[in-house]
């Protein structure tokens, strides 16, 4: 997967720089998100790994995307198809989002809990993470019953596991060693 990230980075950077220059970050993120979903589609994945000519592949991909891509987005698709890189579109989107977050000095934080958290709890988590990361945070909340109780907080390569499940797993590791 790190190979795809390396391959995706220059495309994401080019799209990001273009979007910043033309003040169209939202539009580009939407286009990349749509194109990434198309690339993830099972039938499209088969086409991407097939032996279609790059021009045919690009035009098919653009036709499927329809009016979701403007002329510049279509050009990106053509260049990526020419280089056989359409399958890395989800990674391009991920890199684009990271570049945008760095520009806006925000970081996405994933909060996983066993049940929905109150606004007060979310505010406390947000404040604590902003202090710890020295950046504004955007919380993405998920519910996972297997957490049992507590929360798991992920931001980049930082993981704070305050869940009962995590504590039980650590206890089991200690008891088995």
From Swiss-Prot:
It is found in: Cell inner membrane. One of its GO terms (cellular component) is plasma membrane. Keywords: ATP synthesis, Cell inner membrane, Cell membrane, CF(1), Hydrogen ion transport, Ion transport, Membrane, Transport. Pfam families: OSCP. SUPFAM superfamilies: N-terminal domain of the delta subunit of the F1F0-ATP synthase. It comes from the Bacteria. GO terms for molecular function: proton-transporting ATP synthase activity, rotational mechanism. F(1)F(0) ATP synthase produces ATP from ADP in the presence of a proton or sodium gradient. F-type ATPases consist of two structural domains, F(1) containing the extramembraneous catalytic core and F(0) containing the membrane proton channel, linked together by a central stalk and a peripheral stalk. During catalysis, ATP synthesis in the catalytic domain of F(1) is coupled via a rotary mechanism of the central stalk subunits to proton translocation. Belongs to the ATPase delta chain family. HAMAP family: ATP_synth_delta_bact. F-type ATPases have 2 components, F(1) - the catalytic core - and F(0) - the membrane proton channel. F(1) has five subunits: alpha(3), beta(3), gamma(1), delta(1), epsilon(1). F(0) has three main subunits: a(1), b(2) and c(10-14). The alpha and beta chains form an alternating ring which encloses part of the gamma chain. F(1) is attached to F(0) by a central stalk formed by the gamma and epsilon chains, while a peripheral stalk is formed by the delta and b chains. This is ATP synthase subunit delta. The gene is atpH.
